[in-house]
Every structure is written in C-alpha cells, then in structure tokens.
Curated annotation (Swiss-Prot):
Keywords: Kinase, Nucleotide-binding, Serine/threonine-protein kinase, Transferase. Its EC number is 2.7.11.33, 2.7.4.28. Bifunctional serine/threonine kinase and phosphorylase involved in the regulation of the phosphoenolpyruvate synthase (PEPS) by catalyzing its phosphorylation/dephosphorylation. It comes from Azoarcus sp. (strain BH72). It catalyses: [pyruvate, water dikinase] + ADP = [pyruvate, water dikinase]-phosphate + AMP + H(+); [pyruvate, water dikinase]-phosphate + phosphate + H(+) = [pyruvate, water dikinase] + diphosphate. Signal peptide: none annotated. ADP binds at G157, V158, S159, R160, S161, G162, K163, T164. This is Putative phosphoenolpyruvate synthase regulatory protein.
C-alpha cells in the first residue's frame, strides 16, 4: 500500500476547464503511484472567484499537509496573481506558451477570457451539434442508403464493440458525422456486408474486441444468455474479423484502447483532418 501523501490537484480555468484538465491528466498519468484528489474549478472569471479559489487551495494544503498542484489556463493577470498567493505548485499552462508564441508571431496575445471554448455562435459549434444529431439518428444500423452518403465515416463491428460511444465522441470532439452498423450472424452466414454498405466501402472502419471482454460487457446487459456466452462471442469476433479481411475493411482492436486513441486512429485512417474542440 502506498505511503505517499494524498495531493489535491486543482484544474482551474476561466472557461470550461477542459484544456487544463486534459493536459493535466496527460501529465499526471506519468506518475501512476501518485495519490491524487481532483478538484475542478471552471469559470473563475473575476477576482472574487479567484480569491475564493485561492482560499480552497490553502485549505487543501492544511488538510493534506503538502501543497496542492494547480493546473491553470487563466488568462486575466489579476486572477492569476490572486491564485499565485496561495501555497501551491502553480503550473500556468497558458503563460508557459503565450510568451514564446508572441515572440514567434510578432504580435501580442489578446488575453481574452474564454476565447477558445466560447463558440456557441460559431460554425464549428453548429457542425458539432449537427454531427451529434447525425450520430444519434444513425446508430445501430438505423440509416437509409441516401442518408449514409452524408456520413464522414461508418463504423462496423459486432454488437457492444464500442461503435456507439466512438461515434458520439467523434461527433462531440471533432464534428465528424459517424454512422454505425452492427455485424450480425446473418451477415456472417452470407459472408458479405449488408447491401446498403456496398456503395460506401471507402467510409467503412471496423472495431473488434477480445471475446472475453465482449462477453463481460454483454453479461451486464443480458446475463446468462447465448448472446453473452463466451463461445458465441468467440464465434462472432472470429467471423467479423474474417469478413472485414475479406472485404478489405480497415479495423482496430478496441480492447485496450481508450476512446481517444480509437478516435485518433480512425481520423488518421480515413484521412479526416478535423480540429478538436
């Protein structure tokens, strides 16, 4: 059992905190033995909120007996200064990079609060909403031939192999219109793709998964059923992989991959150059 003290880690932002939390998690993942208690502090966009947050940091330091770690993407010098007065390891993610960028680009930063994630009126936001609606409307094979023409990518694989969450993540994070289609026993018996997919081979990407993991997931949904049995899962996975090889479909084993890794692989494979939001 670890004897390391518990450290409180704050993710502080004047916006949603997504950037601070994402980068913070990436860095902390390099220290698997660290004992961490996480505190999210979004929308710290004025001095009063910053002072309250600084007091929380001081309280955490007293309770833990060690100073907290702060990942910050605050822009306002006033709020940054207030937080610097607290006893913490303060990792200012914007300050670390804004200066070199100003020098390289030959211009001053706007230092505008909420600049990146404040996109409610932008085209990017509209595209994301449309992509989310598309993913929900074209889940689990609910698509007509004409509608599939609008898809940026069509995910295929056996039931519960991760198609739906991946489709939604691609939509929410990248504005990608992703449909998904289940491969079912009838497809394996015919040893061919569903007819409606034939015209869209270039958009197809397959997901597979270890049979043991698939059986575990299916048992949660339909315990003690043939659908969830390990033998059936082995059969379906083997048949799906053979079908994808025969049809020359690119595919990925999702068993040990995060949804972020799966999505990045799909974007690269189908050559969708989309910025993340």
């Amino acid at each position: 059992m670890s004897t390391l003290p518990i450290r409180t880690v704050f993710f502080i932002s004047d916006g949603t905190g997504i950037t601070a939390e994402t980068l913070g998690h990436s860095l902390l993942a390099q220290f698997p033995e660290a004992r961490i208690r996480q505190v999210r502090a979004p929308f710290i966009d004025d001095l009063d909120k910053a002072i309250d947050c600084a007091n929380q940091i001081r309280e955490a330091a007293r309770n833990d007996g060690v100073r907290p770690i702060v990942f910050s993407t605050l822009v306002s010098p006033e709020t940054v200064e207030a937080l610097h007065k607290a006893d913490a390891l303060f990792l200012d993610l914007f300050d670390r990079f804004i200066g070199p960028l100003e020098t390289e680009l030959g211009q001053r930063s706007t230092h505008t609060v909420g600049r990146f994630h404040g996109i409610a009126d932008s085209l990017d936001y509209k595209n994301r909403i449309e992509a989310i609606n598309f993913a929900m409307a074209h889940d689990d094979g609910v698509s007509s031939d004409g509608e599939l023409a609008e898809a940026d990518v069509i995910l295929v694989g056996v039931s519960r192999s991760g198609k739906t969450p991946t489709s939604l993540y691609l939509a929410m994070q990248f504005g990608v219109k992703a449909a998904n289609y289940p491969l079912i026993p009838e497809d394996f018996e015919r040893n061919k793709l569903p007819g409606e997919l034939h015209n869209y081979r270039g958009k197809l990407f397959g997901l597979t998964i270890a049979p043991e993991r698939l059986s575990q997931i299916r048992q949660e949904r339909r315990p003690n059923s043939r659908y969830a049995s390990l033998d059936n899962c082995k059969y379906e996975i083997d048949a799906a992989q053979k079908l994808m090889r025969r049809e020359n479909i690119r595919w990925l084993d999702s068993t040990t991959k995060s949804i972020e890794e799966i999505s990045a692989t799909i974007l690269q494979s189908v050559r969708l150059n989309r910025p993340g939001y």
